[in-house]
């Protein structure tokens, strides 16, 4: 590894302080890279051909869902609807802190379309969808190169109290990885998150 002499490769043009947590993925239809960056109360989209020179494309998030102090750790994946690979939508995952329904930080998501430049949400701005209703679920990110499935893993804690939890060697832990999918219910599209099948190998015996 050789540190790039022209770092940082991307800075906010408006001098924004909360500009971080970049997620980069390959957008094959246009043979380019796309980067999503959390920028205060929105996510900004950039593209690049060489991973060094980045161009601003669009933003999304302001006024949508829960409007917290800040958005963090964005991610976005394209998923089949109800298992049908011929019908797909994008899921934009956003971690928010604070102001969540059950207190502190949590993970919300938006479903919609992405044309390589701009994300268009399916729902109205006042609609909020939570990825997990557990209290300790934050900073959800997806793995790359997981073949024909999408696997995500969250941080198992909450900014409401993580700094006062007694600890020595580490600050909390990750939750179990889960496989993501899109499903319809009553005409509405939702993101499912089920523990990956590999977790079954951790079970050694059953007790009634």
Locate predicted features.
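Short loop/turn segments that connect beta-strands within beta-propeller blades
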Residues: 49-52, 114-116
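Short glycine/proline-enriched turns and hinge-like loops at secondary-structure junctions
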Residues: 69, 86, 103-104
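Structural motif
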Residues: 42-47, 100-111, 163, 176
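Gly/Ser/Thr-rich phosphate-binding loops and adjoining beta-strand/alpha-helix segments
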Residues: 81
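Beta-rich accessory regions
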Residues: 85, 111-208
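Hydrophobic core segments of beta-strands in well-ordered, beta-rich domains
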Residues: 5-14, 18-46, 56-64, 77, ...
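Surface loop/turn signatures of beta-propeller and other carbohydrate-active proteins
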Residues: 1-26, 37, 55-78, 118-140, ...
């Amino acid at each position: 590894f050789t540190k790039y002499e022209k770092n940082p490769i991307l800075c906010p043009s408006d001098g924004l302080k909360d500009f971080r947590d970049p997620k980069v993925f390959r957008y094959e239809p246009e043979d380019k890279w796309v980067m999503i960056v959390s920028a205060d109360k929105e996510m900004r989209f950039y593209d690049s051909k060489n991973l060094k020179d980045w161009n601003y494309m669009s933003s999304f998030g302001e006024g949508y869902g829960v409007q917290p102090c800040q958005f963090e750790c964005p991610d976005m994946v394209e998923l089949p609807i109800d298992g049908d690979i011929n019908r797909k939508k994008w899921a934009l995952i956003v971690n928010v802190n604070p102001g969540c329904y059950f207190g502190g930080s949590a993970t919300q998501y938006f479903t919609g379309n992405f044309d390589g430049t701009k994300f268009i949400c399916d729902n109205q701005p006042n609609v909020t969808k939570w990825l997990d209703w557990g209290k300790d679920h934050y900073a959800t990110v997806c793995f790359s190169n997981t073949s024909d499935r999408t696997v995500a893993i969250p941080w198992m804690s909450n900014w409401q109290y993580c700094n006062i939890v007694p600890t020595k060697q580490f600050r909390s832990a990750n939750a179990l990885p889960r496989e993501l999918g899109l499903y319809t219910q009553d005409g509405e599209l939702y993101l499912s998150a089920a523990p990956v099948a590999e977790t079954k190998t951790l079970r050694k015996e059953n007790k009634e």
